[in-house]
Amino acid sequence: MKSRPICSVIPPYILHRIIANGTDEQRHCAQQTLMHVQSLMVSHHPRPEPHEKLPAGQANRSIHDAEQQQQLPGKLVRAEGQPSNGDIAVDEAYSYLGVTYDFFWKIFQRNSLDAEGLPLAGTVHYGQDYQNAFWNGQQMVFGDGDGKIFNRFTIALDVVAHELTHGITENEAGLIYFRQSGALNESLSDVFGSMVKQYHLGQTTEQADWLIGAELLADGIHGMGLRSMSHPGTAYDDELLGIDPQPSHMNEYVNTREDNGGVHLNSGIPNRAFYLAAIALGGHSWEKAGRIWYDTLCDKTLPQNADFEIFARHTIQHAAKRFNHTVADIVQQSWETVGVEVRQEFL
């Protein structure tokens, strides 16, 4: 069965900063998480097992409790339609899996991650003070954080939607998780994660904060969130975490072997391109910009190793196809503003 690398929320560069600057306890916790993240990034888990095509329009959720262990999926504590068990992490995971499902169904008529009604499983309380959340190709997994650097990872709707979007990308574009195609993979998860949050809050592009993981940073950490889509590189400036290193323009592109070729770093460039397009097009982000990016994600001619220019070209073409050339020009200008030039002969 075909398999994909596992994608996690907290990038290695943040964990490295904690290891360098934290207390003994913080360093140990971050080291354990980093070792696990590194094993995840080279691990390949199989896709979910085949399932019956389920009725559209209704999520099929199951939430499990790992009870601070690392065995998956853990103890089933809430199935679809069951009431709360009083555990806030269980309730948040259950709710946000549902919100994400509803967004993709109501906006894009997509029946779960595989478009066939894939059941959505989540495991909470994974590991001891585990500083991450991840999609392993089959389910969502949430750590509790330590409460001093990171809060529980179920607290942020956009982070939940970010990880679930990796499942959609696996089923559609299958973007290789390395260098620019990997940064696009990460960016798509930020794009749709942000849109799910905006949709849930009823926000326009002007009202949105365009932050990823704003709720994750614990009190005392000097920052707004994990990433800023509007101004990459400005999300945090903290004694422990350092300064947000994301680039916002191709002239700042980071060439590195770390983090699968900088997938969490260089995603800032396409993130800002989407933000600029969404702001210029106005209204709700999912009405035009989001529709264009979704069409591109589902375009079978998009190569798995697409770089920024190839992806940009596809968004411009889909903007013209679904809307008009005025919209396409706005999308093209958004890419050019971040230094991604699309040669005219390819348009």
Swiss-Prot record:
It is found in: Secreted. Pfam families: Peptidase_M4, Peptidase_M4_C, PLN_propep. Binds 1 Ca(2+) ion per subunit. Residues 43-68 are annotated as: Disordered. Residues 1-20 form the signal peptide. Zn(2+) binds at H162, H166, E186. Keywords: Calcium, Hydrolase, Metal-binding, Metalloprotease, Protease, Secreted, Signal, Zinc, Zymogen. GO terms for cellular component: extracellular region. Its main location: secreted. Belongs to the peptidase M4 family. This is Extracellular metalloprotease. It comes from Pectobacterium carotovorum subsp. carotovorum.
